[in-house]
Structures are given as C-alpha cells and as structure tokens.
Design a protein with these regions (language model features):
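Conserved active-site and SAM-binding loop architecture
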Residues: 1-279
Length: 279
C-alpha cells in the first residue's frame, strides 16, 4: 500500500476495514473478457443466481464502441439501465455491415490499449450510472485502474464542460501517474479505498466522515454522494490466451498459483460487494 497514511483521526482501524454494511447509493460493475473463464467462477455464478432482479450480465464488443477490433467483453453490474450494443457479430459493427473484416485484432494492440475500456463504452457506463442515481456528487472507485482509461476519459469530458461533478479515485497494484493508492485487493476491499478517496478528495471532511455512526458509506449517502465501484479485474488467468497455463482443460479449476490467487481475490471482492451493495 503506497498511499501515505491518513491523518490520525482517519486511521484505517480494523472496525472500519470490516464495516461493509451497505446503505443506499452504491452500485458496482465488474468487467472481464466475455470469452474467458471469469464468468464461470462459482462466486460470480452465485451472485447472478441469487440476485436476478438486481444484478445483470451484459455482453458487448469493443468494435461497437469505436475500436477497430472486436474483443468481446462482459459486465456484471447493478446498473439496470446499462445497455450497450450486443457483441459483434450478433449486432454487426459498421465494418461487418459493409461485409469487411475488422481492420485489426486485439493481439496487435498495445498493452495500454488492450487493458483500457473504449472511451465510448466508458461514456455509456458513467451516463447510465448518473441517470440511475440523482446526487450532487458522483464518486467512481476504479479498483483495478490499469493504464487509467477511466480517469483519462473523465478528464476529457470535464474539459468539454461535462461530468463536472464526477470524481474518480484510482487504485492499482502497479503505481502509475494516475493512481491514488496501490492496495492489494487480495488483502483489502473497496471499503479501504473509500476511506482513501474521501481523504484525497475532501480532506476537510475526514474527521466528520470517520466519526459518522454509520461509517463512511452512510456519511457519503448523507452528503449526497453516490458511489460506483468499478472493477476491471485482471484477466491474465481467465482469458483464452492464458488458459493452457493457468486452468485445467475445459473448466475454471486453477492449476497455477497465479490462478489460485486471482480466484481468491475475486471471491474476496464479490463477497464484499454482496455484503455492501446487495443487502
């Protein structure tokens, strides 16, 4: 964890770390390649099965949102109005409608591009969230921010006078120029990132937030701040390219230490989201 410790009245005590009870105003979106094994994790299947009215699985493709290669991706989300175009070729992109091939393939993209959401898809995600929740401020926790595509898109839109009340707090295990903290989500949860976000964005409110009887989530709700926890979870052990190394043939069962660690982290994350959002 590279973020400097907050001031004394805002320490991450064990009670605060474990205080995951949910109140109103939180949503989540999980994202991973649609053709990989992430969706087959027991914790993900149970999440969808236990909350069919509250959690949706949405599949789309990058080529329907401005990129010149297909890459199918899926979202597991509580945003009922998040409705991107179906994946190509189910909904043909403009190249396929002209009877052409996609100009490029994901394997030819840069590492940064491969690990970034298309700007138009980010627009749809954030606009759906803002239409679902009416609030004075919108706090997006980018739990696995990678190369910072969400933070970059928000800055671009704000330069155009849009989304001026949207705040992004970026976490990633790898420290980059856009990251605000570097929490290992095998050991922490987004609850800790919420504390860091308040400390970063509204430092004059940290004492008030930390002393709120309902914890920081209730303080945010009382302050008319709504939260979206977005997690584009690392896909290396779930994507088709890595299955031979990380998973036993034909299923999601892990055979590498990296895969076991990824499964543990995602189970930990989903457990937090179930407890904090879906009560």
């Amino acid at each position: 964890m590279s973020e400097e410790a907050p001031r004394s009245e805002f320490r991450l005590k064990k009670r605060a770390r474990m205080n995951v009870q949910m109140r109103s105003g939180l949503d989540f979106s999980l994202e991973n390649p649609a053709d990989g094994r992430f969706k087959e994790l027991d914790c993900v299947k149970r999440l969808l099965a236990d909350h069919p009215q509250r959690v949706s699985k949405v599949v789309t493709s990058y080529c329907n949102h401005g990129y010149d290669y297909r890459k199918r991706t899926l979202f597991i989300t509580t945003l009922p109005n998040f409705d991107p175009l179906p994946p190509c070729p189910l909904h043909k992109c403009h190249w396929k409608r002209r009877g052409e091939r996609h100009p490029n393939q994901v394997v030819g993209a840069s590492q940064a591009e491969k690990n970034s959401l298309p700007p138009l898809l980010i627009d749809l995600l954030i606009d759906s969230w803002r239409k679902r929740r009416v609030a004075s401020k919108y706090l997006l926790l980018d739990v696995f921010s990678g190369w910072g595509s969400i933070e970059k898109r928000v800055r671009e839109q704000q330069a155009r006078g849009q989304w001026l009340n949207v705040y992004v707090h970026s976490n990633d295990l790898v420290k980059r120029g856009h990251t605000h903290c570097n929490l290992d989500m095998q050991k922490w949860t987004p609850a800790a990132q919420l504390f860091f976000a308040v400390n970063k964005l509204w430092p004059e409110k940290v004492e008030e937030a930390s002393s709120h009887p309902g914890g920081v989530v209730d303080w945010l709700a009382a302050s008319d701040v709504t939260v979206l926890v977005h997690a584009s979870t690392p896909c290396e052990t779930y994507s088709l390219n890595g299955l031979g190394v990380h998973r036993y043939r034909g299923g999601v069962k892990p055979k590498s230490e990296a895969a076991r660690n990824a499964d543990h982290m995602n189970e930990h994350l989903v457990s937090y989201l179930r407890a904090s959002v879906l009560v």
